[in-house]
């Protein structure tokens, strides 16, 4: 099976391509490794598809941050870009075995229930999540042509994540033995999942050729920012003072996001074991320690 991964140079993309190639069951192409794919340019999309002729596509490429604060760009890349990709797939008759599109858990927004299941009505609160919600509607339009599964990952953690993200930033501060750290809302609760587990789950979904489903990638367990801080204190055996900075508190912050993994476990099997948050943090801490000692 020939698999094309869009967004192959990103955090999850790099890890996924590595895992799939390691399995030696697939011929794997990264759309940003072999050739750059501009999702906003239909000709660029078609060029990559014509050259790779994939049997299956994992669509990871997305814009998660806009430096110039222009929200239109989110929709051009995440929504219209997905339209360009899916239309080209049908026109060129590729990816006959299916497509797996990455959405985001952020589309749930603020809900009344503790565990967020796929059956809930999305209530996205920012343009990134809104653009992904629109993307899911685009996917529905093409499900009569291809088997397309949408995954909604919660907070993915692990090696290779940008240091500007919250947890890698905290890990780095503990490795450097900083005396203080500036944080925003300490009570925000998130469902953290290992990038290795995330990629393993994608591999299993591809292998099973799951079609036309929407599935959370989550553990069902939530940790607050303060709990992550406490775990890092234990791992590093270092105490640090927290200074809360209101500038780090997002106006659209969702207080709690914990996924319901029931549907995922129905596919994987109820005996599937997720990597613990402590184990993820320990690996990140040790790796950062090595990086800074070189």
Curated annotation (Swiss-Prot):
Matching Pfam families: Epimerase
Summary of the function given for this chain in its UniProt record: Catalyzes the conversion of GDP-4-dehydro-6-deoxy-D-mannose to GDP-6-deoxy-D-talose.
Domain of life (superkingdom): Bacteria
Binding positions (NAD(+)): 11-12, 38-39, 60-64, 104, 128, 132, 154
Binding site for substrate: 104, 128, 155, 190
GO molecular function, one term: GDP-6-deoxy-D-talose 4-dehydrogenase activity
Protein name: GDP-6-deoxy-D-talose 4-dehydrogenase
Active site residues of this protein: 128
Keywords, ordered alphabetically: Lipopolysaccharide biosynthesis, NAD, Oxidoreductase
Catalytic activity: GDP-6-deoxy-alpha-D-talose + NAD(+) = GDP-4-dehydro-alpha-D-rhamnose + NADH + H(+); GDP-6-deoxy-alpha-D-talose + NADP(+) = GDP-4-dehydro-alpha-D-rhamnose + NADPH + H(+)
GO biological process: O antigen biosynthetic process
Pathway linked to the protein: Bacterial outer membrane biogenesis; LPS O-antigen biosynthesis
Keyword Cell division: no
Family annotation (InterPro entries): Epimerase_deHydtase, NAD(P)-bd_dom_sf
